[in-house]
A protein has these predicted regions:
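Generic detector of leucine side chains in alpha-helical contexts
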Residues: 11-12, 27, 33-34, 60, ...
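Long, compositionally biased
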Residues: 43-69
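Intrinsic disorder/low-structure terminal segments
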Residues: 6-7, 39, 54
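N-terminal acidic leader/helix
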Residues: 1-26
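Amphipathic, hydrophobic secondary-structure cores in small proteins
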Residues: 16, 23-46
Length: 69
């Protein structure tokens, strides 16, 4: 498994914990909103910043997509 994928799994699990939600449900939501790949591709930025900042960014990404739907 690549470092990028390991971090993505870690991020997904920590984000789900932060949201008091199941990781499977979070991933399904991201897939539905078509943001999973975008979040995965943000590895370079996300792995060097505070995890809370990453969570806030993911919240914004999801909110923007929900507004468009």
């Amino acid at each position: 498994m690549s470092k990028k994928m390991k971090f993505f799994v870690y991020l997904l699990e920590k984000y789900a914990e932060w949201k008091n939600e199941n990781s499977k449900n979070i991933l399904e939501k991201w897939d539905k909103l078509l943001v999973t790949e975008k979040i995965f591709d943000m590895y370079e930025m996300y792995h060097i910043e505070a995890i809370e900042n990453t969570f806030e960014d993911i919240e914004l990404i999801c909110a923007e997509k929900e507004e468009l739907d």
